[in-house]
């Protein structure tokens, strides 16, 4: 329980510092829309095109990427599904060749933007933005205008790089905790089960009699 609580606390701490780093007042930086600073488009493939041992990563509608033997793009981009599980919450950062589903979006930042800065900003702010923009209580699908009109701060490239360096370190720390703590929790649970079984393993009467003979 302590380890699980620690993991939750660290994630909350990370989110707090990330949001603080990504807080810009109206007059502090130039504000544009995502459509003004990035190319936004979709892919052409369907989920049924996937091949288990395909050569290239294939970003579809699910949380986890698939594989395909052909690629659509060779670039640095932020990818997210247009609908399906985790819509508006799950984002992938890709560098190199990849294939893309027809209902998944690619966001390719222009020269004024550090791609990692755009990635962190979208991960932090996009879901809240689409919830406010949606007429229903839950967002089930994304449309291109949602991306085009998404507000985007444009600090200097130097400042973007400074923020990215900090947030990337936070990401690495959180990832190592997320991977390491569950293993530690599992190990502790196994240890507990072992000692519990040891405590409650009483010798059978026959064994006890034989031992006293």
Where do the language-model regions lie?
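Charged, alpha-helix-forming regions
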Residues: 1-213
